[in-house]
């Protein structure tokens, strides 16, 4: 299926049953089968308010009755004129119903027209990073190709399985634009991800600012995965090696996983809250069972040690390693079961100790020492990609190796807040320079 955007139908779309012309007023509805997500469309259907089966963006509560997303059109496509406002980015999301669950190849074409565009960043599904900070010269046209997995999910706060047969594509930037979009079924291996909030696809509010948005590394791992695989993330806040199974999340994976797929396990943070899930007992037993079952399906299990937190003693002079026993348990299981292991615990702890508590806090959600913001998720997923590259002989996940040396981790000594323009014009996806707290605008 192909969608052509803008006021002027393409020559190919005229009279074609396979090309749909999309206009700025086309708001999404399940009956129509495609369209843009706006404040109005989100409020008209309760299912469009469930982050896990949509784009992962919701308006700040004080903007819920506003009209921030107002698509416009010209000969180059459908765009937002107000891609950046004072307090963040405004996303434009196109949503399409697909015929089946499974993996799809997405080809997205963007055209700048007469106006240069800065900071184009592309997400798929529930805020999964696909492309980062592209700047366009006038009349420049670019095509992006990536894979998207469509799968059942149990949303956070829900007990039942939701059947999802939609694809969401979100663009942010100074003037985000859709020109053409092609979605086609694609048979490729799937990388299933399991875990807790440090891994999960987390929602964000808009106006969007990355440092004040929760994000797990699984949400940005898609940026590093090549076009030879697709990612299906089933991590959620609060999950451990026990309730991931008992609440039904693992059943979704068992229903879909096949020979040649991968399944990544990263638990520990929530296991540590229960005595029967101690590192050397219940936690270890549950991981062993997961590994045996995944192998029985012909898939490859992979263990990731728990993310280290920004946890220090009271005067911030000594690091407090709260996850050491669980990281050691993972290493023991890896050696025993001959399972590839990615030691995220060690590499994240080394980074936190190197930069110190204050600077490390810039990569975590404000006031949270364990859950990363979008900058931290980008950083941690990059660490994982680099480690996969290093052990690729035993962990052959198809990644974009050209990106693995470009993980950005230095802390810059900027004493004042960065503006959105400065953030976009920087050479890389830089860490935040200040804590940006979303606040309701004062009425004039």
List each language-model region with its residue ranges.
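Compositionally biased, intrinsically disordered or flexible polar/acidic segments
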Residues: 1-205, 213-215, 444
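Short beta-strand segments at enzyme active-site cores
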Residues: 264-266, 301-305, 341-345
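Substrate-gating cap/lid alpha-helix
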Residues: 311-345
């Amino acid at each position: 299926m192909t969608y052509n955007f803008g006021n002027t139908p393409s020559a190919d779309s005229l009279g074609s049953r396979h090309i749909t012309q999309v206009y700025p007023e086309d708001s999404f509805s399940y009956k129509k089968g495609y369209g843009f997500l706006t404040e109005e469309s989100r409020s008209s259907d309760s299912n469009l308010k469930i982050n896990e089966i949509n784009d992962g963006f919701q308006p700040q509560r004080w903007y819920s009755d506003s009209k921030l997303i107002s698509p416009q059109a010209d000969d180059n496509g459908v765009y937002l004129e107000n891609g950046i406002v004072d307090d963040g980015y405004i996303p434009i999301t196109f949503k399409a119903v697909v015929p089946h669950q499974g993996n799809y190849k997405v080809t997205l074409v963007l055209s700048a027209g007469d106006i240069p565009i800065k900071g184009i960043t592309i997400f798929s599904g529930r805020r999964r990073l696909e492309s980062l900070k592209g700047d366009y010269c006038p009349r420049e046209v670019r095509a992006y190709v990536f894979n998207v997995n469509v799968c059942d999910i149990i949303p956070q706060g829900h007990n039942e399985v939701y059947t999802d047969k939609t694809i969401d594509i979100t663009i942010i930037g100074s003037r985000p634009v859709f020109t053409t979009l092609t979605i086609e079924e694609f048979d490729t291996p799937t990388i299933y991800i399991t875990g807790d909030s440090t891994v999960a696809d987390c929602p964000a509010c808009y106006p969007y600012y990355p440092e004040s948005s929760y994000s797990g590394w699984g949400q940005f791992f898609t940026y590093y995965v090549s076009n030879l695989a697709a990612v299906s993330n089933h991590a959620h806040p609060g999950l451990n090696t026990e309730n991931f199974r008992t609440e039904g999340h693992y059943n979704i994976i068992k229903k879909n996983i096949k020979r040649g797929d991968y399944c990544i396990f990263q638990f520990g943070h929530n296991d540590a809250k229960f005595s029967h899930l101690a590192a050397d007992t219940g936690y270890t037993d549950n991981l062993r069972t997961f590994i045996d079952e995944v192998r029985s399906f012909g898939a490859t299990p992979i263990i990731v040690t728990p993310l280290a937190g920004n946890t220090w003693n009271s005067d911030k002079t000594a690091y407090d390693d709260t996850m050491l026993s669980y990281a050691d348990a993972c290493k023991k299981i890896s050696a025993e079961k001959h399972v590839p292991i990615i030691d995220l615990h060690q590499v994240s702890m080394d980074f936190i100790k190197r930069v110190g508590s204050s600077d490390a806090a810039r990569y975590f959600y404000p006031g949270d020492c364990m859950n990363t913001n979008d900058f931290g998720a980008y950083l941690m997923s990059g660490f994982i990609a680099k480690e996969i590259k290093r052990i690729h002989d035993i962990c052959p996940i198809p990644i974009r190796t050209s990106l693995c040396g470009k993980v950005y981790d230095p802390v810059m000594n900027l004493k004042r807040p960065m503006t959105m323009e400065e953030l976009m014009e920087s050479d890389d996806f830089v860490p935040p320079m200040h804590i940006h707290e979303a606040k309701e605008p004062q009425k004039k």
